[in-house]
Design a protein with these regions (language model features):
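Charged C-terminal helix
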Residues: 195-219
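Short, small-residue-enriched loops and turns at beta-alpha junctions
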Residues: 25-28, 53-57, 135, 152
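Glycine/small-residue-rich loop that forms an oxyanion/phosphate-binding "nest" at active or ligand-binding sites
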Residues: 29-78
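Conserved N-terminal subdomain of the carbohydrate kinase-like
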Residues: 1-49
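Short pre-catalytic strand/loop immediately N-terminal to key active-site residues, enriched for Gly-Thr
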Residues: 145-157
């Protein structure tokens, strides 16, 4: 959770991975993210980038693109609209602004995998596109993860929970070196997160609760 420019390198140096989440993006935090990314690169740590709201403003899209170029993320994790926007921008096409930052699923599984693979080829990162069914474009393999519950899409912050899990799983696999199977760590993080959602939804429904209780149960 470090955001100060003068501490991010120290904090990054005692971590096993780095998560760059653009959720509360401000101009003053960008240099800190860049510094953390540089330190992670020196240390060989996996870097997970979540381009939150990349479809909401030009500022967010450009910051995400800059992070891709400067921090060289190992994993890029976003919803379908965010991943499509980054893919378009990196291919030289302007992606327009759309309302909101929450997840939506619009294309077929094949079209979503195609977009994820396209961004993977452009960036060298493992690309994760979350939605009703999560798709992963690994270095050599593609995955579809079907764990989860519809209520999870209604919980603000569920994506941030996933980012944390992904950082933990990738940090563990990062100990195997730069050629460690990060895509497997990513898939396991997605599955674990989805299973937590399924269990939390079942527990909450049994008590007659709603999405507010699901959030607490997931934690």
């Amino acid at each position: 959770m470090a955001q100060g420019l003068h501490e991010v390198e120290d904090v990054t140096s005692i971590c096993s991975s780095l998560v760059l989440n653009l959720g509360t993006l401000e101009e003053k935090t960008i240099p800190a993210m860049e510094a953390a990314g540089r330190k992670a690169a020196v240390l060989g740590l996996p870097v997970i980038l979540d381009p939150v709201g990349a479809t909401a403003s030009r500022f967010r899209r450009q910051t995400a693109i800059d992070m891709i170029r400067k921090a060289a993320p190992s994993v890029i994790r976003g919803n379908e609209a965010e991943i499509r926007a980054l893919n378009q921008e990196l291919r030289g096409h302007e992606a327009g602004n759309t309302c909101g930052v929450d997840s939506g699923t619009f294309g077929t599984i094949e079209s979503r995998l195609e977009t994820a693979c396209s961004l993977r080829d452009l960036t060298g990162a493992v690309v994760v596109m979350t939605g009703e069914e999560d798709v992963v474009a690994g270095k050599e393999r593609r995955f579809i993860v079907r764990n989860g519950h519809p209520w999870m899409a209604r919980i603000t912050g569920s994506g941030c929970m996933l980012d944390g899990l992904m950082g933990a799983f990738c940090g563990l696999y990062g100990e195997l070196g730069p050629d460690g199977p990060l895509e497997e760590a990513v898939v396991m993080a997605l599955s674990a997160h989805g299973l937590c959602g399924e269990l939390a939804a079942g527990e909450t429904a049994g008590r007659g609760g709603g999405t507010g209780q699901v959030h607490s149960a997931c934690i």
